Amino acid sequence: SNKDVTFQTGINATDFLTVGLKNASTTSLGLASGSSGVAKLTSERVGADDKSGVGVSDIKINGQNFLSATLATLASSTEAAGAVADAINLNTGVHGAKATAFNEVTSTITSKFEMADVVEINGEVIAQSYSAQEFVDNVNLLADGVQARLNADTSITLFNNDGGQIILADAAGTGLTTLGFTAATYEGYVTLENIDGSAVSI
């Protein structure tokens, strides 16, 4: 049976488009048929799982097969989004779209900065910080495959530009909670844009 998937079509929470999948296997890619009219589409988080069952023609980009060859299992991959983007880009010459992988996790907005203890980001221990800027600086200095930025609303965004996993852990206690984050493994996203700047059709 068909399932729904939500595409983010802009930077705001209200900028989304829900479309139906023609088979359940495409759920793991966050891509589906039926969306058009926007210059950029962003998938849901791309799970690290077995994608070998997704056929090259299961999804059409601008009316053409989205892949030139089937994907392998990504169950042990730490960069599933990047692998999907690379596979889509192998067929760019046919469908005319470019895929880009990225990842980001943004904290909740807190009334004041607090970091109760150390946290672990992608396996690296980030020392207890006493200001938001100090925490951002420590992440940028120490964390492997992750950068941090302080937003105007005082939230903090952890991000990368390759779609690699962002793994947040809190072995010592409540450091992440006080920062406004939740311990988890966060998979990356894939964006689609046509290389000629026209609207993408999926």
Enumerate the predicted regions with their spans:
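Amphipathic alpha-helical coiled-coil/heptad-repeat segments
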Residues: 1-202
